[in-house]
Amino acid sequence: MKKTQYNNLVSSYARVLFHVSGSRLGIIREEVEFLLAFFKDQRDVFVYLSHPMISFAHKKEVMLSINEHLSENLVKFIMVIFANKRSSLLILILEKFLSLARENENEFEITIKSAETLKESDIKIITESLSFLGKIIKVSNVVDPSILGGFVVRYGFNLIDASLKSYLDRLVDLSKMEILKVRNFV
């Protein structure tokens, strides 16, 4: 299966859980956060659940053992994922669901890519300038020397590119267009 097919599949399942959650979105969100933390702490449990040779019945037993922390709707949803042999995608689906829930609550995470590590004051200026979008719940600073200077901010599916590299790339493109114009008119 291609990466875009995986992404579409993950998004489809996440959207279904989001819509099924309805008025219980906050509760389901907390349960999903608990489950993701559990799988992070107990990695071997997720490896077991995502293994294709483990039967549906065994996977169901494991999920029912942690059922006291999860609502019936979430357990049923996870059982559908297992029944459809998509258990290896469970974490991605749950993370995508959280992304949809945050978007619904007007919360988002941002990643700031810069040529060198930004100072807290610089990060604060950037986050304050983006506060009109909603509540920023997490900021990460990724260092990428290839952007030469400035920064690139990614939030959700959006990108703000204020890097020196992109500026120079645009300048090169404009120069090429001008050269072509001159050649065509001379």
Curated annotation (Swiss-Prot):
F-type ATPases have 2 components, F(1) - the catalytic core - and F(0) - the membrane proton channel. F(1) has five subunits: alpha(3), beta(3), gamma(1), delta(1), epsilon(1). F(0) has three main subunits: a(1), b(2) and c(10-14). The alpha and beta chains form an alternating ring which encloses part of the gamma chain. F(1) is attached to F(0) by a central stalk formed by the gamma and epsilon chains, while a peripheral stalk is formed by the delta and b chains. It is a peripheral membrane protein. The keyword Membrane applies. F(1)F(0) ATP synthase produces ATP from ADP in the presence of a proton or sodium gradient. F-type ATPases consist of two structural domains, F(1) containing the extramembraneous catalytic core and F(0) containing the membrane proton channel, linked together by a central stalk and a peripheral stalk. During catalysis, ATP synthesis in the catalytic domain of F(1) is coupled via a rotary mechanism of the central stalk subunits to proton translocation. PROSITE patterns: ATPASE_DELTA. It comes from Wolbachia sp. subsp. Drosophila simulans (strain wRi). InterPro entries: ATP_synth_OSCP/delta_N_sf, ATPase_OSCP/d_CS, ATPase_OSCP/dsu. The keyword Ion transport applies. This is ATP synthase subunit delta. It is found in: Cell inner membrane. Belongs to the ATPase delta chain family. The lineage of its organism: Bacteria, Pseudomonadati, Pseudomonadota, Alphaproteobacteria, Rickettsiales. Its main location: membrane.
